A protein has these predicted regions:
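A glycine- and small-residue-enriched flexible loop/hinge signal that marks low-structured segments
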Residues: 2-396, 421-425, 431-433
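Generic hydrophobic secondary-structure signal
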Residues: 3, 377-381, 385, 405, ...
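Residue-level marker of positions within ordered structural domains that often coincide
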Residues: 212, 414, 451
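C-terminal structured domain segments
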Residues: 401, 405-447
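C-terminal edge-of-domain segments
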Residues: 432-475
Length: 475
């Protein structure tokens, strides 16, 4: 019975202890505070000089004890009561606690000064260590956001202009993970679904994957499974090389011999080299930050479609100047850029102090569709005509219908041909014989004569004296 009473008494004792009154804390009124901190205490200005306000390296102001000056009643009350100063009050309390801690220890002023310096050094070392970890952990994300910023800087003519762009929150490494293809399949499905609608006005034209996809096989996968079936142009990059020689070492490696090729899906891939500086390294980083060039060039292409037309590659000094880009990772002169371009890769170069895209190549090695502007022009015409023809299905096939189609298509083709338009010339043939009509089919054959960009100028000088003719040919 006694043991049971003891067990029953324990929770009651705990409750009694919990209910014990807290130690009373004496509150100091404003008048008493002023008298304590006034002449009876000491000269407040001397104390204020010991703990003044200061600015951090980031420009943030840390308030000092001068904001508690009893002679400045209005300022002191604002500082102690307004929510705007909550963060500053917390910082000041922390500073005062540090001073109180060190002053309460026994020892001379020299000992206090020494201990403060040692503690400050430890905190500085710990801060630097943690900040390096923070910047290292967030570097990839920051690079992505700065690449997105480069895209908008080149896509927009005005800061508030609407840009039709969609973003997938997924990295290139995740998209190319051989052990988890679900993310790549989901992205491909999202793009394919819009292209398979009856109306394809909202389908995608470009897919930008900033950074290196890891291998020729991965680049081909994007072109074969995403670009070619959906008529979407893929823009991506080589790795972030520091030197031109590193680029060529990679491109001349036997494992990259198949980067260019005659497979049709290679018409839908453009690769870029020479990264853009995003910002200089800060005190917690060892290297500057660089962004992949494909994002900036994609923005330039988006803007170019509206301003000059997709027939014009966003390349060269006149049309390929990259906005918000001053420094490039490495220098590439004319021979260097030509060597990179011969491998199907488009380098960025510094031209009169401006970053310029100096190439409009695809990975297709044959003529015509080895230029992205021509491939995109063909795709635009195809998508527009397909969208129109989808609206004509199940109309009775007779001469009136064929003539009406021919008139509509001819009107569209004339509107995009000649002058500053996207085509040089075209030819359209619409045909349906009796056998085809029984199968409910109509042939629409379109031949396009696109506009080709100038890449090389052959300069030939001939001496005026025909008897002693001198030829100088430079390519």
């Amino acid at each position: 019975m006694a043991d049971e009473e003891k067990r029953e008494m324990k929770p009651q004792e705990a409750e009694a202890m919990a209910a014990a009154p807290k130690e009373a804390v004496e509150k100091v009124s404003d008048e008493e505070f002023a008298s304590i901190m006034g002449d009876a205490f000491a000269d407040f200005s001397k104390l204020a000089n010991l703990l003044p306000s200061f600015k951090t390296a980031d420009g943030d102001l840390v308030r000092g004890v001068e904001w508690l000056d009893p002679k400045k009643d209005f300022q002191r009350k604002d500082f102690l009561s307004k929510p705007d100063f909550a963060k500053q009050r917390k910082l000041l309390v922390h500073r005062l606690k540090i001073w109180m801690d060190f002053l309460s220890r026994s020892g001379s002023l020299d000992d206090i000064r020494k201990n403060l310096n040692e503690e400050a050094a430890k905190l500085e070392t710990n801060l630097e260590k943690n900040m390096r970890k923070v910047h290292k952990a967030s570097r990839e994300m920051e690079t992505t956001y700065r690449a997105v910023d480069k895209f908008f800087a080149n896509a927009q003519q005005e800061p508030d202009e609407k840009v039709n762009a969609y973003f997938a929150n997924i990295s290139a490494e995740e998209l190319t993970n051989p052990n988890d293809k679900e993310k790549f399949e989901n992205l491909t499905k999202a793009i394919a679904e819009l292209y398979r609608e009856w109306s394809i006005k909202e389908c995608f034209a470009m897919c930008v994957v900033p950074g290196y996809l890891g291998s020729v096989e991965n680049i081909d996968t994007f072109g074969r499974q995403l670009g070619f079936p959906n008529k979407v142009h893929i823009l991506t990059d080589l790795p972030n090389f520091e030197k031109f020689e590193e680029v060529m070492d990679m491109l001349e490696d036997p494992s990259y011999a198949n980067l260019m090729g005659i497979d049709n899906y290679k018409q839908y891939v453009s690769v870029f080299a020479n990264y853009l500086m995003a910002r200089n390294a800060n005190q917690y980083e060892d290297e500057d930050m660089w962004t992949p060039p494909s994002a900036a060039v994609a923005g330039k292409m988006y803007q170019g479609d509206t301003i000059v037309g997709m027939q014009q590659p966003m390349a060269g000094f006149k049309y390929g100047k990259i906005s918000d880009a001053k420094y490039l990772r490495f220098k590439a002169n004319q021979p260097d850029a030509s060597k990179i371009n011969e491998k199907g890769v488009n380098p960025l170069v510094s031209f009169e102090g401006t970053a310029v895209a100096m190439g409009a190549a695809t990975l297709f090695s044959k003529e015509t569709f080895n230029v992205y502007s021509i491939r995109r022009t063909y795709d635009y015409v195809y998508k527009t005509m397909r969208n129109y023809l989808n609206k004509q299905t199940f109309t009775v096939i007779d001469q009136k219908f064929i003539d009406a189609m021919r008139k509509d298509i001819d009107k569209f083709m004339k509107a995009i041909t000649g002058g500053d338009n996207i085509l040089q010339d075209y030819n359209v043939v619409i045909f349906a014989d009796d056998e085809m009509r029984r199968r409910q089919e109509i042939d629409v054959k379109v031949s396009l004569n696109p506009k080709y960009p100038a890449r090389t100028f052959n300069i030939e000088f001939v001496a005026w004296n025909q008897d002693n003719q001198t030829n100088v040919k430079d390519k």
